Amino acid sequence: MSRVFHIPGVIFLLCAFVLLFLVSISLPYLTALDFARVKFSNGSPTVGSETNPIHQIRFGTWANCWYENDGTRSCSSAHNAYSTTIYDGQRQDFVTVGPSWTRGLAVHPVATGVTFIALLLSLSTHVTFTLLASLISFLAALLTLIAFAIDIALYAWVKHQMGKLDGIASNTDTAPGFWLTLVSFLLLSFAGCTVCFGRRRDRMEGATTYNYSWKDRFRRRRY
């Protein structure tokens, strides 16, 4: 495949794989790579059975982490489809972000695995492998788009639920993991296109070479 398209395609796949790999680790191991982040400006909300007030909570792939007013950080146990319950200061009102909203976050590591396969295939210059790399890149892009849609749904639901807590002022924002997923989707889309265009260019160059070769043989026969 033409190096003009091959090298950028491999770079796009490598960058997408690294970003998705980091997002797949996420909380509780990489606490900066969450999808939705809630900051509380007043009131004394608490999480689960904890009684110490918190000022922030983050939602990641495998767990959530919260920060108490004294700066102490705690995280839930790491597993898929975790649930979070947040109480108001009097522990009379509460909201829950259930497992149905976090179960789909496991699509991120699936997209990471598919991206890794596409990356390995893209390292070959064989026509069959480059075609497979292009197709699998688009598959990884589709899975990443699904993961991003799940991130959007989680963010919207968290924002909706936090607004239902009486006496608690909160601000819900998208977090780094949210945007890294979007960037990964764009990179995978670019990678699939560059690999596909590179293969198309190789076919055109091969056809041109064959055409000139046939004309040369025809001229030699005439003279």
Regions found by a protein language model. Give the residues of each.
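Membrane-embedded alpha-helical transmembrane segments of multi-pass integral membrane proteins
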Residues: 15-26, 111-121, 140-150, 184-194
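Interfacial segments of alpha-helical transmembrane regions
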Residues: 9, 129-141
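A surface-exposed beta-alpha-beta supersecondary segment
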Residues: 20-23, 29-103
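Juxtamembrane helix-break-helix junctions at the cytosolic face
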Residues: 120-132
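Hydrophobic alpha-helical transmembrane segments
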Residues: 59-62, 175-189
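Intrinsically disordered terminal tails
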Residues: 1-52, 191-223
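Juxtamembrane membrane-interface segments at transmembrane-helix boundaries in membrane proteins
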Residues: 1-2, 89-104, 164-178
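Juxtamembrane loop segments immediately following a transmembrane helix
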Residues: 142-179
